[in-house]
Amino acid sequence: SFVDKNRIGIWGWSFGGFNTLMSMSEGRAVFKAGVAVAPPTNWKYYDTVYTERYMRTPKENPDGYALNPIERAGKLQGALLICHGSADDNVQPQNTFEYAEALVQADKDFKENYYTNRNHGISGGNTRNHLMRQIANFFIKELK
C-alpha cells in the first residue's frame, strides 16, 4: 500500500476550509490532522447575495443552513489548526470565533492562529511566510 492510513492530513482555505472542517466532523476518523484557513462555518454569517443565490434563504432552506461545521463541532476527530485574519471582509472572523466556541463547549482540543489586520488572503510583510510555516510545522508534528 502506498498510503499510510495513520498519517493522512487535510487542509483548505475559505470554502476548502469549510470542506476540511466538514470532512473532519463526519464521524469517521479518516484524517489524523487538518488545517482550516478562513473557513465559513455557518452560512448565516456569509454574504447573503452569494449564499442565497445557491441556498435560498434560511427560512426556505433550514436543512441546508443547518449543515455546517458549527453544528458538527462535537464530532470533530483529529488534530485541528484553524487560522483567520482579523480584517477578513470576505469570510468574517465571527465564523472562526463561533466555531472555536462550539469546539470549546464540545470539549475539543484545537489550536488557533489569528493574524491582526490581515484580510482573507492573510498576506503582507512576513505574514504569509509565518502562516505557511505554522501549517507545515503543524503537519510535521501531527503526522509523524
Task: Identify the role of each PLM range.
Residues 1-144:
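Active-site-proximal cap/loop segments of hydrolase catalytic domains
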